[in-house]
Structure formats: structure tokens, C-alpha cells
Design a protein with these regions (language model features):
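Conserved hydrophobic beta-strand within the GNAT/NAT acetyltransferase core sheet
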Residues: 179-181
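Metal-cofactor-binding active-site regions of metalloenzymes
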Residues: 1-177, 187-191, 197, 201-202, ...
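Acidic/histidine-rich helix-loop elements
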Residues: 184
Length: 308
């Protein structure tokens, strides 16, 4: 394995969380830069959700999505990222009454011109419930040949039981899509276990697994990776400080961990800052290289893996 620690693979980055304040103002000329920056000033998870919503509200037409995607891709490429799996809130597009196919066409246009390889995770909001999740899963299956590799569930983990999404997950997985839910970010380890039982291929965040030795062993033995986002966890209050982050304990337990930026504009972070955070937690070059390699190995685009 290379000892180079430069990360080049991003597996957990939200399109809607990548809108810099300057871009928000471009999308909404009535918005001042000070107002846009204030959206991203918060101290807890509820405040983060409000900031995310304020960004989403500015995405009013397909062209806005194309501009957002292009800006994200250019930023990732400038960091040296060559492959990204981008989460976009397809469920929110439907909730806003927008034409999902038109938005998707704009995103595909941006991806076709991107200076890196892009694949997509079609995400739904947990509190919206089962029916829209099933609609998105069926839509994602129809678009799988166009770059969608996974189906995800995000949002408030306590808002709707995991079992409600059994059919949506089955629709996606039976057609060959992977399942990448958020779990164990702000709730309990039990939520991770429920998503594993639903068939999760990777877990977004998953840091609460550290509280359950049996779950740690399950994740390790089934080789289910965690998409860990340290800066995000600190900013949302999921952990009280970087020093208290369980990344080291997860890694030492043999769980496959990757590092990711999550919502880079909202949290003002990059993939590189997440590796710097890991170094601050005591990870050395060899361990950082292993984590970078985990992301490449856990990418859902197997053609990308073979090309490495």
C-alpha cells in the first residue's frame, strides 16, 4: 500500500450542503452575504438542519442544481479528489414539487463535464416516511444506468422507525443498488443495528457503534464500512469536541472507517481537513494511508476500483 496520505476519494458529501454563501446569494439575489453566512452559524444538530433547509430553499430550478453541482465538482477536483459519490436529496426535490427528471438531467449535465468521476446516492428524508421513499427508490432504479449507485436515508433518526423503509430498501437492493443510510450519528447504536438488518452496505456516520461491543464486532465481521465525518460531528454537537471523537476506538476495533466532508460549505471543511483531524487524534501516516485506501476499496463504482 502507498504511504501517501493524500485523500482522493469522497464517499459522503451532500450536494445541498456544499453551497457556499456566495453561491446562495447568486441563486437568491435578495439574500445578503451576511445573511447567507449566518445560515451556517449554529451550535447543535437542530441549527444545522435549519442551515441545510435554508440552502435547499435556494435551489428553485434545475439550473440551480447544475450550478451547485459544478461548483462542488470543481472544489473537489481542486483538492485532488478523483472520485466522489455525491448524496442528493431526491426526496426533497419531490417534496418541493419540482420535476425530479428535470433536476436529474441538470445534474447529469454537470457530472458529464466534471473534472472527476462522479456517482450518485439518491437520498430521502426519514421523517417524510415510507411512501416518498418508495417513490424515490423506484425512480433511482430506473436511473441506475445513468450513474446512481445507491439509495440513502437521512435526517432525524428518531422521526420514523427503520422498519417503515423495508419495501423502499427492497426495491433498491433487488435492482442492484446499494443501501447507504445515515445511522448512529445523533441517536443510539440500536439505530445502526436496525439499518444493518435492513441490508445497509455502508453506514453514514455510525459513530454510536462505539457504545456497543457486539455491534462493533458485527460491523467488523460483515465488513460494513462507516462513512465518518469528524468536523461535522463536532459542529452538530454529536460529539463535544474533536478530542472526544470515537474515530480511534472504531478504527482500533477493526471496523472499516472512511473519512468524509459531509456538508463542506456548512461545516467549512474539506476532505483534507478531515484527514488533518484524524492526525490530530493520533493517526500516523500508515494509518491515514489505510483509511484513504478504505475509501477507494469501498467505492461502489467497481470500475473505478479496478483502475486504481
Amino acid at each position: 500500500m502507498s504511504t501517501v496520505t493524500h485523500p482522493d476519494t469522497e464517499l459522503h458529501v451532500h450536494l445541498e450542503g456544499s453551497l457556499e454563501p456566495e453561491l446562495l446569494c447568486r441563486l437568491d439575489p435578495a439574500l445578503t452575504l451576511a445573511e447567507a453566512r449566518a445560515f451556517y452559524e449554529f451550535g447543535d444538530f437542530a441549527g444545522f438542519i435549519e442551515g441545510f433547509k435554508n440552502a435547499v430553499r435556494r435551489l428553485q430550478q434545475p439550473e440551480h442544481y447544475r450550478l451547485a453541482a459544478t461548483a462542488l465538482f470543481d472544489s473537489l477536483a481542486a483538492q485532488g479528489v478523483v472520485y466522489a459519490e455525491v448524496i442528493f436529496s431526491a426526496g426533497v426535490v419531490l417534496w418541493k414539487g419540482q420535476d425530479l427528471d428535470e433536476v436529474w438531467a441538470a445534474l447529469r449535465e454537470a457530472a458529464a463535464e466534471a473534472p472527476l468521476r462522479v456517482r450518485w446516492n439518491a437520498d430521502v428524508i426519514r421523517r417524510f416516511g415510507a411512501e416518498p421513499a418508495e417513490q424515490v427508490a423506484a425512480w433511482a432504479v430506473r436511473r441506475a444506468s445513468e450513474g446512481i449507485v445507491s439509495f440513502g436515508i437521512g435526517g432525524d433518526e428518531t422521526s420514523c422507525p427503520a422498519a417503515e423503509f423495508t419495501r423502499a430498501v427492497a426495491i433498491a437492493r433487488e435492482a442492484g443498488l446499494k443501501f447507504t443510510p445515515h445511522a448512529g450519528e445523533t441517536s443510539t447504536a440500536e439505530n445502526i443495528r436496525e439499518m444493518v438488518e435492513l441490508g445497509a452496505d455502508r453506514i453514514g456516520h455510525g459513530i454510536r457503534a462505539v457504545n456497543d461491543p457486539e455491534l462493533l464486532a458485527l460491523l467488523r465481521d460483515r465488513a460494513i464500512p462507516l462513512e465518518v465525518c469528524p468536523t461535522s460531528n463536532v459542529r452538530t454537537g454529536a460529539v463535544p469536541s474533536l478530542a472526544a471523537h470515537p474515530l480511534r476506538a472504531l478504527y482500533d476495533a477493526g471496523v472499516t472507517v472512511t473519512l468524509n466532508s459531509d456538508d463542506p460549505a456548512i461545516f467549512q471543511c474539506t476532505l483534507a481537513t478531515e484527514f488533518a483531524a484524524a492526525r490530530a487524534l493520533g493517526f500516523d501516516d500508515r494509518e491515514l494511508a489505510a483509511i484513504a485506501e478504505n475509501a477507494r476499496r469501498c467505492a461502489f463504482d467497481y470500475g473505478f476500483q479496478r483502475a486504481r
